[in-house]
């Protein structure tokens, strides 16, 4: 009986010791538990590098005499922007992009230099009206996707594209990879030029004209800063 009482007294003493410890350090325990679950993922910022990137617009020949015309391969020469993302999980992420509308130029060798100058002049003055609308911009509203086993991230970027004074919501699929301090995004998407009130150039009295669908392709490099 005495041994049983001794065990009970020892157990009660142990419980009292735990109670004293908890009473002495309640704030420390609560703060540590909260901080481990509420810290947001670190954000990494990348600046787009136009010099190391490729950004193209393809305008297709259309009209009754479409076979008399040529597709146009237009390069975007001057653009800037920023990507923000969580380095381990990619998401949450955001993209902001600004293009100088007077930097779009014809690149196809099928055209002579004189023809390219005429096309570029029409792009600036008739199609994009660069003096009135000097910038084309895109700002993401949401980024979703999944990380593949090889480290490539398949992303779907939804956002607002503003061109020729008109803003429309578009989706951009992209394959994103990261190596060291560099980020690379590749993909393509289409827009309807009529949605942005962009005029089409034509020839042969309108029997050859640029189609409504414009195809954008990109291979963009960005650097962490």
Where do the PLM segments sit?
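Short, aromatic- and cysteine-enriched interfacial helices/patches
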Residues: 1-5, 24-25, 203
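Bacterial N-terminal signal peptides
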Residues: 13-26
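Intrinsic-disorder/low-complexity regions
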Residues: 5-8, 22, 31, 38
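Bacterial N-terminal signal peptides that target proteins for export
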Residues: 2-16
